[in-house]
């Protein structure tokens, strides 16, 4: 694997940076820098800005609107978007649901939904986890019973990310209660405004709103919204989760957060010296940087193989990436000392820029760090708990 920078890739990187400087509004970049949960209008604005450029869905094939980039260009794109503090687009739609639709859905569904996803005309959430079905997803109980040209859906989903913003849900439902757990599941596309569907917020430990619980009470879903074949939904779910776990390494996010820690450590002082000069702190930061670089090279290896074998290492990337994000967030809070624990949300779930701890105001560069560290506790759980991922690694890679 050649790790020397390609001049073409460097030119592409500079093009991305110029685009972000010209197109990203300063107030939006400021919110992104503080790692606020994205506002819906920010998300939609940026998705449409990217779509106008042909960059909204970098991972999609050209035939469905993708830009035709190399794997390395896709990685650089994500890296520069995070470094430039651009808001995340509808990643559930573009990176998870979209690929399922263009791979398994009918031509009519592709024609209807893919353009909407590219332009953020309708945002998406995924209905997988239930109160009794998290890591053991195949035990889900939400039922869908065929009634003429519709399915009647009853049940509950929980931890539904961005459900409060979503217009549509990609949901796993049980259509054959008598079949083996994994064989009686189907995938439905459900309108979040359908009668009988209720979405309720779940405020997490960071006091922000990103997840929800969704209730279905005789919700009628057109049968034409079935993805692929009835009772074949488990295969589509595994495909989707493979993408989620590969993407959850989040190296661009981690590198951006490391740069923020270095900025803080140059300003904050310990024993009269910049914190960055403290040997213990510097060693911890160096260890994180080394581990991040190792993870980045692991991703480069997958990219060099044109993505072959990505599914087999998805669990490894998920485990390493999620644990790194927690370590980085915790170190950032520690760098601020006692002020690092301050959290005060405003009504939109954004972290108040006037956070204080006692009489000591939190500096601008420290706003939201405590909330971020709290939210990062979930990274080792969502997308498949790391304990489950280690079992997958043992079976599929180590052959234990």
Model regions: which residues?
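Amphipathic, small/basic residue-rich leader segments at the start of a protein or domain
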Residues: 1-91, 112, 116-119, 274, ...
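Glycine-rich beta->alpha junctions and the first turn(s) of the following alpha-helix
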Residues: 5-7, 197-295, 379, 395
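Glycine-rich phosphate/cofactor-binding loops in nucleotide/flavin-utilizing enzymes
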Residues: 24, 72, 76-77, 96, ...
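C-terminal helix-coil-helix/basic helical segment that borders enzyme active sites and/or dimer interfaces
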Residues: 28-37, 270-273, 293-359
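Internal helix-loop-helix
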Residues: 44-47, 51-121, 162-168, 292, ...
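A short, Trp-centered hydrophobic/proline-enriched beta-strand micro-motif
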Residues: 120-128, 172
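A structural signal for short hydrophobic beta-strand segments in well-ordered beta-sheet cores
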Residues: 142-145
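A short core secondary-structure module
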Residues: 149-150, 154-200
